[in-house]
């Protein structure tokens, strides 16, 4: 395809290098810098804050502000996603976490109390994910999804994903929030997907992503279900952890997993 200035570009290579290569270390440093600035809400992609003192700083120094077309992104990230529609198949790790028994909890609590619980879950999750250079893919209902790649988190990105899972399990347990977590790794499509009217989202899709989500659905409160595939990629010996063979919807073969419970 051609960019807006008429230059030819291989979109797949752009997304692959951005997500998988350390060539974009400056982007990683900026994401960390933006995360240190107050205040939420933020750009889903670069962590630039939209409001408060942090919002004023990034508007003045970087020209970033909330996009008029997509409130999840800053104007510059949204523009880049439209300029490079498409993506690439990349190696990544995925974390899905959700509040177990949320329907029953919502019936026991006042709406305001339940909303505060979910907000604590969102806040704790996003802080831990961002500190380990993960991309928060979505916050929806009672669930959080995030992804890691070498371009963001370095060669130990799978190990960092598992670290977040352990820390998140511990933090939520201390707050009395019952959370189950699934971690997996593999190849998925990562890039900008959009609609005919120009609205874009930056996401990861594919069978491996679906597997991670289904692992989370099998995790009881306080459990972290990690696929053997992810443990191998992280070079972690899981031989002393509980082993399970799970039948997952849409997956023809049983998936071998290990079960963690907070920090090991």
Question: What is each model feature region?
Answer:
Residues 25, 35, 49, 155, ...:
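Long C-terminal interaction/binding lobes of large macromolecular proteins
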Residues 32, 80, 124-128, 167-174, ...:
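Amphipathic alpha-helical regulatory segments at dimerization interfaces
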Residues 85-163:
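Catalytic NTP-binding/metal-coordinating core of nucleotidyl cyclase/transferase enzymes
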Residues 100, 187-188, 210, 229:
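Alpha-helix/helix-capping structural signal
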Residues 126-160, 171-207, 255-258:
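Catalytic core of nucleotidyl cyclases, primarily class III adenylyl/guanylyl cyclases
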Residues 97, 185, 226:
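A conserved hydrophobic position in a structured secondary element of the catalytic/binding core
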Residues 1-90:
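Regulatory cytosolic signal-relay segments
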Residues 218-264:
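Cytosolic regulatory/linker segments at or just downstream of nucleotide-handling modules
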């Amino acid at each position: 395809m051609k960019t807006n200035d008429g230059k030819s570009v291989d979109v797949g290579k752009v997304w692959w290098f951005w997500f998988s290569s350390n060539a974009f270390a400056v982007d990683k440093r900026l994401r960390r810098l933006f995360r240190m600035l107050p205040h939420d809400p933020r750009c889903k992609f670069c962590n630039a804050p939209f409001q408060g003192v942090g919002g004023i700083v990034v508007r003045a120094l970087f020209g970033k502000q909330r996009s008029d077309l997509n409130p999840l992104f800053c104007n510059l990230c949204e523009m880049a996603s439209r300029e490079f529609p498409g993506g690439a198949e990349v190696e990544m790790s995925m974390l899905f976490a959700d509040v177990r028994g949320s329907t029953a909890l919502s019936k026991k609590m006042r709406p305001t109390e339940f909303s505060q619980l979910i907000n604590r879950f969102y806040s704790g999750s996003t802080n831990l994910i961002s500190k380990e250079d993960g991309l928060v893919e979505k916050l929806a209902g009672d669930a959080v999804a995030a992804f890691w790649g070498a371009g963001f988190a370095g060669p130990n990105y799978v190990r960092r994903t598992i670290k977040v899972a352990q820390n998140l399990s511990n933090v939520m347990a201390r707050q009395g929030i019952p959370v189950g977590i699934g971690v997996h790794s593999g190849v998925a499509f990562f890039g900008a997907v959009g609609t005919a009217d120009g609205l874009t989202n930056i996401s990861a899709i594919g069978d491996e992503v679906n597997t991670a989500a289904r692992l989370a659905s099998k995790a009881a409160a306080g459990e972290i279900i990690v696929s053997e595939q992810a443990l191998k990629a992280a070079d972690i010996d899981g031989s002393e952890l509980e082993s399970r063979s799970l039948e997952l919807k849409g997956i023809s073969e049983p998936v071998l997993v290990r079960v963690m419970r907070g920090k090991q």
